[in-house]
C-alpha cells in the first residue's frame, strides 16, 4: 500500500502516514475550512491500514490547536483505533504537547478517557 503525505499549512497540520513503519503522525494547528476533506483521506488511510493484516499502528501527535470539526474527526480516528484494539490489534498513541499549553493537555486527557489502548501524553519544553 502507499504512504500518506499531506503538507501542513497555516490552518492544517502536516500529516504523514508511513505504511511500512505502521506510523501516522500529525503536527501543527488544525482549523481547516473543510475538515472532512482533510481528515477524510486520513480516515481512509487508517481504515486501509487496519484492514491489511495485524501489524501495529502507532499515532504520533503534536497538535497545537483543534477546532470543533477537527476534534470530531479525531474522535472518528480514535474510534477506529479503539475498535481495532478491542479486536486484538496492537495500536498506540503518543500525544506530545508544549507544557505551557495546558489546553492541549486537557484535550488529550479528554480523548484518553474514551480509549483503552495505550495512550501516552508527553509534555515537552518547546
Swiss-Prot record:
**Residues that bear Phosphothreonine:** 68
Q: Which UniProt keywords apply?
A: Phosphoprotein
Chaperone among keywords: no
Task: Name any one Pfam family assigned in the record.
Answer: SiaC
User: Is Phosphoprotein set as a keyword in this record?
Assistant: yes
InterPro entries recorded: SiaC
Origin superkingdom? Bacteria
Full protein name = Uncharacterized protein PA14_02130
Amino acid at each position: 500500500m502507499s504512504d500518506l503525505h499531506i503538507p501542513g499549512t497555516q490552518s492544517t497540520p502536516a500529516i504523514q502516514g508511513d505504511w511500512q513503519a505502521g506510523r501516522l503522525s500529525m503536527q501543527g494547528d488544525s482549523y481547516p475550512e473543510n475538515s472532512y476533506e482533510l481528515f477524510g483521506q486520513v480516515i481512509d488511510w487508517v481504515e486501509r491500514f487496519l484492514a491489511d493484516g495485524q501489524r501495529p499502528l502507532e499515532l504520533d501527535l503534536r497538535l497545537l490547536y483543534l477546532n470543533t470539526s477537527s476534534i470530531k474527526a479525531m474522535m472518528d480516528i480514535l474510534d477506529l483505533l479503539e475498535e481495532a484494539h478491542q479486536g486484538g490489534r496492537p495500536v498506540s498513541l503518543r500525544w506530545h504537547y508544549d507544557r505551557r499549553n495546558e489546553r492541549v493537555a486537557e484535550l488529550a486527557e479528554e480523548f484518553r478517557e474514551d480509549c483503552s489502548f495505550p495512550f501516552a501524553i508527553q509534555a515537552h519544553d518547546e
